[in-house]
Structure formats: C-alpha cells, structure tokens
Amino acid sequence: MKMTLLGAGVRAPFVLRGLAAGAADLDLDEVVLFDTDPERLELMTALGGHFAASWGAPFTVRNEPDAESALAGARFVFSAIRPGQEAARAVDEEVPLKHGVLGQETTGPGGFAMALRTIPAMVAYGQLIERVAPNALLVNFTNPVGIVMQALHDHTSVRAIGICDGPISMQRSVAEFLGLPREQVHADYAGLNHCGWIHRVLVDGEDRLPEVIDRFEELQATDDQWALFDPELVRSIGMLPMEYLYFYYYRDTAVEHIRGSGS
C-alpha cells in the first residue's frame, strides 16, 4: 500500500514516526514525499528515510518531484502544505498588526489571506487525486482546515477528512492530569478547527469535567496550553477552551503581546 505526503515540511518526520509505531496494523509498503521545493524535498526524504530505518519501519521512504507521479495509485494522502511558505506567513501576520488587528494563520485577515493562497492549490491537488488515485482518502492537515475542507467538498469528489492535533492534545493533557491512561478518558470536543471546547470528560461513564474545572489552577500548572486563560473565565463558560480561543477572548491583549514581542 502506498501513502503520499503532500508537503515535505516539519510535519513529515512526525507522520513517519506515527506510521512506524502503527506499522503492525498497516499494510504499508512505501511512503512517497512530494514538495514544490526540490532542496527541501531531498533533505526531508533523506532525513525521513534515516529515521524510518532507525525506528524499524517496514516501509520504504522515497520522493517524487512530480505531483502526478507522487499521487498515482496512493491509498492515503496526507496534506500539510503552505503556499508561499514562511515569507507569505510573515506578511499575513505583520500587515494586520500594523492596523491593530490580529495576524494569525487561521484567524482574521491573515487567515483569510492564507485561505486565498491555499484553496486553489488544495482544490487542484484534489482534482489530481480524483484522476490518478480515485480510491485514496485525503487526510488534510493544511490550514485553515475548515475552509479548505469546505472547498474540497464543494469543488471535488475526493474523499477527505480534516484533522488537527489540538483536541487530542487537550484530551491527553486532561488524562495525564487525572492520572489515567489516555484510552480511559473520553473527551467530547465541540466546535470548529482552532475554535472549540471540551464540554464533557467521561471516565467509566462519569463526567469528570466539573472536577477538572474546579481544579483548573492545578491543571494550568501541569500544561502551558491552559496558562492563557483566567480560571474564572473557564468556570463561567463551564468548558475547557482550545488554546487558539485566546485570540478571541483576549483580542486586544493578544495584539499587544505580539507587537511587544517583536514577532
């Protein structure tokens, strides 16, 4: 079975690590990397191949500089692309800040600018997948995930799901705080990508969220992702907020801090 990684960026080694760890449950023969930056593609292929071998992965890692060849016959496609790369990201973040507006890749005008660059590229890849890998499942990690997924569903017939590691990170944090295995803790997350809340934490059928919220200061001391929020705010909403909601709950403060950091 073939899997293609669209975008050979910093996420590639993490994806390969997960694939290697789950290899016993996968019938994966090869992972093919594709990127529009030839130098980065060669570098990440060499790095990924070295890591995969050191992890004992049963699949090969190679690259294809041509998107059609990279995607042809793939059973799964993992997408993590950034059209314009870091130079465009810097513009997305800096221009809004000059006008007192948050600049961020999924929020406000910066997020919209990224969407304008990303949607045409992702729709084009989706249409290519339709043609050369019609049975593939596209797993999209490309931001802004929500609007990119809407575009894929509206303008292609490719099977696609959007993912984010945020909710999993939140669930893992709560499980560790409660001193329980992650598999024993079911966290109900409601909302959109980078805009959601955990509204229930089930352990053996019992909702432990009220306890977690009552002890929120203790939770904050165990994981920095909660440090942004005032405990009284969390108690007033009765849910655990995704860290990106900081940019909504504390917009003016966020803009001030980003400006002050010089980044």
Where are these regions (language model features)?
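Conserved N-terminal Rossmann-fold NAD(P) cofactor-binding segment
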Residues: 38-73, 80-89
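Internal, well-ordered domain-core segments that constitute the primary functional module
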Residues: 125-198, 202
